[in-house]
């Protein structure tokens, strides 16, 4: 990659007319083994700081991510003020530093579908598309190194009647730089979005065909 043409940009006060909301409420997840290709990539010769972390700098003429036939992403709902995406610098030697991305979600409801999802991805790598409340979509994972559940993830039934209950996954991904989809990216777009599986009730774990395979974990 050629970085010689990047022009630095100053960081002025945040525009009060922009969407500056914090948090994450929605994420999409798919096991790496179910993905054929990630077509949205960094530009080879970025010219701005935005370019440096943007993937698919302009809208693609194909899906941003291609899955195997019959496979796709599931949507995960996170409760208000309970979802967060954080990047932490790691490494001490200049030239060897990188980032650890950590996406934390809380899906309310200690139900079979949610518990089953955690059990299913416990020992495998996944690709995650996180929708931030500010409108940006971040990609965690690549074909060589997917995101993984961090150690110590919790699922809880709660104790008191007023306690929260549900799953609290934290998905981690080590990366050299962030992967943020282009402005205007829409995961549901049939041309350049991502394959998303049909909705399934989180209460019953059943879809409208009577199958008991978890495909989506949504709020109720």
Language-model features, listed with the residues they occupy:
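Mixed-charge, glycine-accented linear interaction segment located at domain edges/termini
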Residues: 145-219
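N-terminal alpha-helical "arm" segments
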Residues: 1-29, 192, 197-206, 210, ...
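Generic structural motif
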Residues: 11, 32-35, 108-112, 133-135, ...
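Solvent-exposed edge beta-strands and adjacent loop segments
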Residues: 2-6, 14-100, 146-161
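Structured, beta-strand-rich domain cores
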Residues: 76-146
């Amino acid at each position: 990659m050629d970085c010689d043409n990047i022009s630095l940009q100053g960081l002025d006060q945040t525009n009060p007319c922009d969407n500056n909301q914090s948090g994450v409420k929605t994420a999409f997840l798919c096991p790496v083994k179910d993905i054929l290709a990630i077509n949205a990539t960094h530009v080879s010769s970025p010219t701005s700081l935005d370019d440096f972390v943007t993937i698919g700098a302009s809208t693609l003429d194909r899906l941003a991510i291609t899955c195997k036939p019959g496979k796709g992403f599931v949507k995960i709902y996170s409760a208000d003020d309970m979802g967060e995406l954080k990047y932490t610098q790691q490494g001490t030697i200049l030239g060897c530093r990188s980032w650890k991305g950590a996406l934390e979600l809380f899906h309310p409801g200690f139900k079979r579908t949610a518990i089953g999802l955690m059990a299913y991805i416990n020992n495998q790598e996944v690709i995650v598309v996180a929708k931030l409340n500010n409108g940006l979509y971040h990609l965690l994972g690549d074909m060589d190194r997917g995101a993984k559940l961090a150690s110590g993830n919790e699922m809880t039934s709660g104790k008191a009647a007023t306690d929260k209950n549900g799953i609290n996954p934290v998905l981690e991904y080590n990366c050299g730089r962030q992967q943020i989809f282009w402005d205007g990216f829409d995961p549901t777009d049939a041309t350049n979005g991502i394959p998303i599986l049909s909705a399934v009730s989180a209460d019953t774990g059943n879809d409208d065909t009577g199958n008991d395979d978890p495909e989506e974990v949504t709020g109720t």
